Amino acid sequence: MRLDQVARSLLLKEFVSGFALAMRYLFKPKATINYPFEMGHRSPRFRGEHALRRYPNGEERCIACKLCEAICPAQAITIEAGPRRNDGTRRTTRYDIDMVKCIYCGMCQEACPVDAIVEGPNFEFSVETREELLYDKQKLLANGDRWEREIARNIAADAPYR
């Protein structure tokens, strides 16, 4: 063994440098969040649980154009449109999303011309069975009603970048 190797092993240089590094970070503020008691900041572009939105008068926004169904890469969206109404518009009779298939890419939200389908701020939607992850129109509208204020705020915050 050479002399410098002996000196390093006797003086425990690696141990001392590692210990000094640990001591330096010991007294700094912690970077972790005490979840679920503390919630971290989420971006306005966060993609969580899907929701169908309504207009302020209570009418659903979806016009049954089926662009979200066509663009979905996972083929997780199924839409059936009702007959045209007297004013020429259509509404959906069935709007299903298979959340097991969904990859949360956000393409459905980007394709929607009326901001009807959005990915909301909720990320805590655990279930006990796979069947509960098959969202129908009523579940999606209920999500939209529950999260509308936060969804509208996120869309407004993201509007300059769209």
From Swiss-Prot:
Membrane topology: Peripheral membrane protein
Binding site for [4Fe-4S] cluster 1: C62, C65, C68, C112
GO molecular function: 4 iron, 4 sulfur cluster binding; iron ion binding; NADH:ubiquinone reductase (non-electrogenic) activity; quinone binding
Note on how the cofactor is bound: Binds 2 [4Fe-4S] clusters per subunit.
UniProt keyword list: 4Fe-4S, Cell inner membrane, Cell membrane, Iron, Iron-sulfur, Membrane, Metal-binding, NAD, Quinone, Repeat, Translocase, Ubiquinone
Primary gene name: nuoI
UniProt keyword NAD, yes or no: yes
Record has NAD as a keyword: yes
Cofactor(s) needed: [4Fe-4S] cluster
Subunit (UniProt): NDH-1 is composed of 14 different subunits. Subunits NuoA, H, J, K, L, M, N constitute the membrane sector of the complex.
Family recorded in the similarity comment: Belongs to the complex I 23 kDa subunit family.
Name of the protein: NADH-quinone oxidoreductase subunit I
GO cellular component terms listed in the entry, alphabetical order: plasma membrane
Protein origin, superkingdom: Bacteria
Organism of provenance: Methylobacterium nodulans (strain LMG 21967 / CNCM I-2342 / ORS 2060)
Enzyme Commission code(s) on record: 7.1.1.-
Reaction equation(s) it catalyzes: a quinone + NADH + 5 H(+)(in) = a quinol + NAD(+) + 4 H(+)(out)
Enzyme class: translocase
